[in-house]
Regions:
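Extracellular and organelle-lumenal recognition/adhesion modules and their flexible linkers in secreted
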Residues: 2-335
Length: 335
């Protein structure tokens, strides 16, 4: 055994030194819950929350970003996701939290041994019977499907229960993936009981899915924070007012068009959602006016277009300056 292998083994078993950064080892993007482009708190039955992670239940639940606040049992990971039943809720529907891998990232695991690991702890009023949390790796034989709507040939490759305490613990599970599986998903869920109190939740972080029979120290999927953001932007990109606007081309005094390059090539041509379009402005020919409407005008994996209507300004053929102001653009290529 080399010194590097020995050091890694000791660190893994003792929880000691910081793990080496190994880009590509972890198949799950944003496993440390550092990227939250959509916001940091959600209260709904089904939605994407932290980048790449979605919640699902038959009733509204809360998912939020929290500080891990424990440098002893959980060193070197700043954030976690809190999955919570709403205070006062009497719904006992399962609360699920999962990430779908696209087919191109699932096929490399076919026929291999995998290990699924994460850190988790319970809230003070966690209501699952015997403090149980369920952990699953789900497989399917389809292409780029979503676990909420179901996988073709769906099967649980890993399906285990674990017991939470209010202290962070690391859990790991190992199994072999069938040679015919073309999609994987990681899921945790709990089944609440009774009526929820204020701290009926569990928290999770350091989520990792890797090839091999041993849970190695946690690493970001892309190695660095910048790389992790780029990995997340393959599926969702949030263009905010802080990004400015740039130039657009006027078709008339009241109609303009803009085209933008997306910083990361997306999984597929994204759908475009615009919020608060009237918060944007256009400046042309020495004057300026408010935008009255913005709509998507085509997209590809690398570019997207906008069609803008506005008050009279400039002239056809002018290059105008566009400021998003408080308007935001969301590009979605999720599964």
């Amino acid at each position: 055994m080399s010194r590097a292998q020995l050091t890694s083994t000791v660190e893994q078993n003792t929880g000691g030194a910081v793990a080496p950064v190994i880009a590509g080892k972890n198949a799950l993007a944003n496993g440390a819950f550092e990227i939250w482009q959509r916001g940091t708190s959600f209260n709904t039955a089904s939605a994407y929350t932290a980048d790449r992670w979605q919640q699902y239940s038959n009733s509204a639940q809360s998912v939020s970003r929290q500080a891990t606040s424990d440098s002893t049992n959980l060193p070197n990971i700043q954030y976690c996701a809190r999955v919570q039943r709403n205070n006062g809720s009497s719904s006992t529907a399962a609360l699920a939290f999962d990430q779908n891998l696209e087919t191109v990232n699932s096929i490399p695991f076919a026929g291999k041994t995998i290990t699924y690991s994460f850190y988790a702890r319970a809230g003070a009023n966690y209501s699952a019977t015997s403090n149980v949390l369920n952990a699953q790796i789900v497989g399917g034989t389809g292409t780029d499907q979503n676990l909420i709507t179901g996988y073709t040939g769906q099967v649980n490759i890993i399906s285990s229960t674990l017991t939470l305490t209010t202290t962070w613990q690391r859990f790991s599970f190992t199994a072999t993936v069938g040679t015919n599986y073309t999609q994987l998903a990681a899921r945790t869920y709990y089944i609440p009981t009774g009526t929820a109190s204020a701290s009926d939740y569990y928290e999770i972080t350091g989520v990792q899915l890797e090839a091999g029979s041993v849970a190695t120290p946690f690493s970001r999927a892309a190695g660095t924070l910048q790389g992790e953001l780029a990995a997340c932007c393959r599926y969702f990109y949030f263009d905010s007012s802080n990004a400015g606007g740039g130039l657009c081309r006027q078709a008339s005094t009241t109609q303009s068009y803009a085209n933008y390059r997306i910083p990361t090539v997306m999984r597929v041509a994204p759908t475009i959602t615009i919020s608060n379009p009237t918060g944007a402005y256009i400046f042309s020919g020495g004057g300026g006016t408010s935008i009255t409407g913005i709509s998507g005008n085509g997209s590809s994996q690398a570019y997207y277009g906008l069609s803008l209507t506005h008050g009279s300004v400039g002239a056809a053929g002018y290059a105008a300056d566009l400021s998003f102001g408080t308007a935001t653009i969301q590009l979605n290529s999720e599964l």
